[in-house]
């Protein structure tokens, strides 16, 4: 015989309240009197009750759940964004369903369809370029959408981020103004739209200073090891190289470590700059120059925008540019 699954009515009877009160407490604890809530919580803890949210997610107008798509669990960038999102959702009793699509748009499409099947109230996407089918499903779902890390080009609904092209331009100009350089190479990673925008910003700065752009951009996911490999290849192909601008800090830290291995003085012989301003990069010796991006704030703002639009569909604050900072460090 199967064990009896504890019901809301069982908890209500033990706590001396109505089933409706227990249901309200599970959905929104703050809407129940403190003493009553504590009594219900105590009963739930004593009997190890775990709410079954699936029926409510499918039947209710609101599931109090948000979907989040990220391209990598290994990148600190997205850990910071998730922390920002959770800082908001936890305060409003929202749950998050997180899916990783490994920088593959077909995988993103599949993940979006899966998340929509849970009747999510809104969704956060890490990129702005999707398959036609992904866009079709999102538009049909008629839920709020926020796209992250970019405020250029068309958007599905809302967006929060910064101008990648301008940020790259400002950093490369800073490199060229700090020291006389003749050959600064762009070190990229796996091809994506943001990487391309940064490359365009790099090109803008190089051409402004009458220098020729150079690029090394393998189809591989970023890592410090990849940065070392890229820097090794770059120096072999360009012995007179005197600077590298990297699409992110992982690549830049790898380049810096390779220079240390080769006994190349940074920044005296070679200038190195990264992108995103990770804490580990600032703690390197010498401290890595980088574009500091507001990852936590981007996540927090994205969640706030979603919840605001869920509560008020007339919300029209659709583009938020949170900017960036240039950190000089000691590698320019």
Curated annotation (Swiss-Prot):
GO annotation, biological process: D-gluconate metabolic process; regulation of DNA-templated transcription
Positions of the HTH lacI-type domain: 6-60
The keyword Transcription is annotated on this UniProt entry: yes
Gene3D superfamilies the UniProt entry points to: 3.40.50.2300, lambda repressor-like DNA-binding domains (1.10.260.40)
One Pfam family per UniProt: LacI
Transmembrane regions: none
Segments of the chain annotated as binding DNA: 8-27
SMART domains: HTH_LACI (SM00354)
InterPro entries assigned to the protein according to its UniProt record, in alphabetical order: Cro/C1-type_HTH, HTH_LacI, Lambda_DNA-bd_dom_sf, Peripla_BP/Lac1_sug-bd_dom, Peripla_BP_I
Keyword set, alphabetical order: DNA-binding, Gluconate utilization, Transcription, Transcription regulation
UniProt GO molecular function: DNA-binding transcription factor activity; transcription cis-regulatory region binding
Function (record text): Idn operon regulator. May repress gntKU and gntT genes when growing on L-idonate.
Name under which the protein is recorded: HTH-type transcriptional regulator IdnR
Lineage: Bacteria, Pseudomonadati, Pseudomonadota, Gammaproteobacteria, Enterobacterales
């Amino acid at each position: 015989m199967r064990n009896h699954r504890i019901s809301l009515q069982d908890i209500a009877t033990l706590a001396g309240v109505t089933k409706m009160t227990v249901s309200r407490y599970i959905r929104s604890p703050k809407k129940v009197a403190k003493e009553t809530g504590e009594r219900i919580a105590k009963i739930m803890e004593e009997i190890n009750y775990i709410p079954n949210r699936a029926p409510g997610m499918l039947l209710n107008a609101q599931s109090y759940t948000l979907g989040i798509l990220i391209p990598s669990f290994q990148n600190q960038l997205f850990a910071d964004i998730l922390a920002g999102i959770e800082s908001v959702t936890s305060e409003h009793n929202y749950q998050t369903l997180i899916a990783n699509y490994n920088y593959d748009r077909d995988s993103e499409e599949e993940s979006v369809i899966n998340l929509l099947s849970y009747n999510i109230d809104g969704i956060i996407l890490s990129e702005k370029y999707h398959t036609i089918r992904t866009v079709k499903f999102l538009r049909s779902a008629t839920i709020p959408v926020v796209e992250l890390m970019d405020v250029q080009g068309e958007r599905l609904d809302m967006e929060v981020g910064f101008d990648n092209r301008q940020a790259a331009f400002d950093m490369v100009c800073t490199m060229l103004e700090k020291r006389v350089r003749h050959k600064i190479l762009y070190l990229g990673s796996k091809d994506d739209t943001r990487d391309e925008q940064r490359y365009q910003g790099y090109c803008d700065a190089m051409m402004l200073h009458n220098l020729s752009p150079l690029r090394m951009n393998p189809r591989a996911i970023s890592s410090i090891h990849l940065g070392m490999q890229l820097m090794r290849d770059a120096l072999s192909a360009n012995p007179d190289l005197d600077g590298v601008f990297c699409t992110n800090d992982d690549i830049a830290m790898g380049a810096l470590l390779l220079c240390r291995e080769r006994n190349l003085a940074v920044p005296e012989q070679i200038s190195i700059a990264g992108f995103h301003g990770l804490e580990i990069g600032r703690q390197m010796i010498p401290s890595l120059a980088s574009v500091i991006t507001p990852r936590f704030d981007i996540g927090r703002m994205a969640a706030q925008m979603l919840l605001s639009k869920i509560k008020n569909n007339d919300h029209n604050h659709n583009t938020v540019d949170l900017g960036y900072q240039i950190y000089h460090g000691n590698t320019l």
